[in-house]
Amino acid sequence: GAVNEVYDLLVEFENYIVGETIIPIKNTLSGLPGTDISEIERVYSKVEALMQASHFLGEHGDWQQISVANTALAAKKILEDQDKHQAAVCSAYAASVYGLSVLADSINDEKNNSTRFIVITNQKVFLKDAKKISICLELPHESSSLYHLLSHFAYNDLNMTKIESRPMEGKSWEYRFFIDFEGNLADPAVKNAIRGLREEGRNLRILGNY
């Protein structure tokens, strides 16, 4: 799933996406050397990593799951606390950096799990050979507003690859939508679709063409 804080930051700051990379994620359960998995009482990691290992963690329902900023900090905490009742959901690399032992390997629910990272700049750069577009816009709380929004992709034969919604602060039942679709800003079909999207929604922003 998406990391919601990233969407919020894209809106807050005038940054632009210029690239993306997909990195395979293989998390472990790691603890202090000499720890037995039966000793574990508390597990630390970022929320997304805990969710990605929900099946494994669910088999140990008595463990307390505690969220921290990221998986590396979780591993660092285990080292600093020196408590064998604690473990971290983290990569094998993070475990090795902080001198932890892997108690269980490949604990992700999805064995082909990966994370998409975006490359951003504060310059308004749209690459000429780009093939993907990211936008965001706001929709009013009105009947069929989302249907009309999506119709512009179908009408212009554009392949939408992702859509996520975030509630708008201070506006009940109104949402900001983040959409990825294939194309280049120079394409006539893309220009026509964006023209229609501006009419359907509010505050449309092109986040990147990469």
Q: What are the residue ranges of the model-derived segments?
A:
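Domain-level signature for soluble enzymes in the chorismate/prephenate branch of the shikimate pathway
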Residues: 1-210
